[in-house]
Swiss-Prot record:
PANTHER family: L-2-HYDROXYGLUTARATE DEHYDROGENASE, MITOCHONDRIAL. Disulfide bonds: none annotated. NCBIfam families: mal_quin_oxido, PRK05257.1-1, PRK05257.2-1, PRK05257.3-2, PRK13339.1. One of its GO terms (biological process) is tricarboxylic acid cycle. It catalyses: (S)-malate + a quinone = a quinol + oxaloacetate. This is Probable malate:quinone oxidoreductase. Pathway: Carbohydrate metabolism; tricarboxylic acid cycle; oxaloacetate from (S)-malate (quinone route): step 1/1. The keyword Transcription regulation does not apply. Its EC number is 1.1.5.4. Belongs to the MQO family. GO terms for molecular function: 2-hydroxyglutarate dehydrogenase activity; L-malate dehydrogenase (quinone) activity. It is an enzyme of class 1 (oxidoreductase). Keywords: FAD, Flavoprotein, Oxidoreductase, Tricarboxylic acid cycle.
Amino acid sequence: MAHNEAVDVVHVVLVGAGIMSATLAVLLKELDPAISLEVVELMDSGAAESSNPWNNAGTGHAGLCELNYTPQAADGNVDIKKAVHINTQFEVSKQFWTYLTRKGTFGSSKSFIAPVPHLSFVQGEKGVSFLKKRFELMHQHHAFADMEYTEDKARMAEWMPLMMPGRPADEVIAATRVMNGTDVNFGALTNQLLKHLTSAPDTQVKYCKRVTGLKRNGSGWTVSIKDVNSGSSRDVDAKFVFLGAAGAALPLLQASGIEESKGFGGFPVSGQWLRCDNPEVVKHHQAKVYSQAAVGSPPMSVPHLTPVWSMARNPCLFGPYAGFTTKFLKHGSIMDLPLSVRAGNIGPMLAVARDNMDLTKYLISEVMQSMEQRLESLRRFYPEAKAEDWRLEVAGQRVQIIKKDPKKGGVLQFGTELVAAKDGSLAALLGASPGASVTVSIMLELIERCFPDKAKGEWATKLAEIFPAREKVLETDAALYRKINAQNNIALELVEESSETQSYA
């Protein structure tokens, strides 16, 4: 194997060319144009894994329709705090895209974001009772003031014309609608950010490169990188390393040996969709519609029927149907899971296996499903669905977080977690949903944790320019929320300037 003895030196190495690394790299260059960066990616293009539109159909997460973000307690109370927070996180993402759009970083923002109504749909007395309580609470908050609720089937036929024909006349159903939802093509956005990076000084984006080693080097790191085509290797010294490699972030984090990585494990879950390209079907469904997960199913199983506007012919996807594989990436190895087992995480992993038999049964049942059984699930949404219009499409991998827990030994965590070295020299992003939609908030958290002095000092003015309002104030200040939201919507071409009173999320 050829090895280059010369060691390259950069300020920052980012592993993985997805939305996380692309966002962090562009943000760092805005804060310090002199910073030197290298992005390394195993595949031959950016956004090849979780950021790819086929692998990430749950986009535009703003808490408008995703019912798992508003859980109902045993006493019947509905908690909307998470939905409010995710909504404001998405608004922070929009502030960053607005800033870049105004700078001319992108051509038209229409290439990656578009207005799409967000609907929630429920069945049965319990479902209707829950949705009504959820609406009554959310409608009072300024972020959801435009939400509509109905139990009227004629009105629902206007909102979701594909889903209403063929239903029993006495079926108990309800829906909410927010007209000003969005859909985001994170693949297109990622590639635009990466293209922008390649034109910046002291910045490189390199493909077909595998990180084979991470070693401490004083206050920084030596990153060993192998070219998967030629077999040659090189070392890069960096003051800061970000592991944004989707499911592959966990083994890389483990390879770093930092104390903060101890006890983390990963539980890989694969995804599948039913896909429809028939234009006669697709034209009748132009909204994201989310429902409730079946009793005993994990949050990742929340069913939804959604158009993918960013693709040719704008297909519809329904799902997700879960599966199990030991791969951490769609293009990964079946050895990913077994090789991630360590003395420090085997306890939490066994505890999760013990305490999550329902999840195990669910995944087995999903894997064993026939096409006809999958169509039965679809017909809850779309009663007149025809088998010949739909085909199975493989989606991306999700690696749910397993972490130590003082009481249970280990817990399975649905969400994202930023793990950072105590000295701020390395950080990794683990987990899944809401993921891409709140990327900017997560990267801001990383900057504040790993570069605290600069965030409060020399970068503070620029951060305030890019982000005039952060999550906490957006959650509580209705007037400011409406102002920021309106500015973002105009800049991102979600509304005409004369319509600026509308609130898009």
